[in-house]
């Protein structure tokens, strides 16, 4: 069955009926539509004019061959930059060998509809220049494989930052690292007045560096962390989910942890003063290591293998016999 005429970036709930009664339902959000008001160009044109780009730029990439993003710095005149995968067949392939940062004041960088493979043991965003900044980062509807981290901030002129990761699958986080991975956000080298991170409708599958790591590591500044409708699978019990997050307001809802284990906080000094939990779940064989959340969570009466029988192949489709009430976390796997 195909449903047409749906608006972009809109949440819908579809119901299936049998004999006049609801037998199943699924809630989903449609993908973001291509924004307007940008100078749109191909990747080839963008490369040819890279150092002279300015204003609001949308790089439209289509076809099956994909492209290699090897630029380290965004031109100082660019205020907004979007990498947009435009294919009727799904995501457009993109390889990276170097993380990208800004040489000037860049308000926003976005990645949409891309199948990103890291070939350089790097991060998607790597801001390493004190003369520039990226104030807002958005990654949606992407598959990201073998990357060392998503956002790494070593230097920045901005006093605030916002990061949104939505509708993504991140596989093999830190798999190629010879030491630690950089997680979803590493900003411990910069002090920002505020920091906001939202991760939603996303799965992080197999996330293990060669040494102990943190998924969210900041520098003590206030702000918010929101984790919603996510699944974390095959983590390392020596890793910490949050570090230096005492002054953050953390909200976790409908999120599942399976296979392996993790320390919710790096140490007692990292425990968030304000922690809101509304639907935090773990498989029966997953371990939350001390220091724990300090909030109630639900241990499902099923092992990780029972929940995800094909998890070893990085397919987290729920087992056919998993009851509906245990099909929590990222709903893309509730098929």
Specify the residue positions occupied by each region the protein language model found.
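N-terminal "mature head" segments of proteins
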Residues: 37-41, 329-332
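N-terminal extracellular ligand-recognition/capping segment immediately after the signal peptide
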Residues: 41-48, 54-80, 86-99
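Surface-exposed, short loops/turns at beta-strand junctions within beta-sandwich domains
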Residues: 3-10
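Short strand-loop junctions, especially beta-strand C-caps/beta-turns
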Residues: 12, 62-64, 154
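Extracellular recognition modules
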Residues: 13-17
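Extracellular beta-rich repeat passengers
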Residues: 73-74, 79-315, 320-323, 330-335
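Extracellular fibronectin type III
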Residues: 8, 19-34
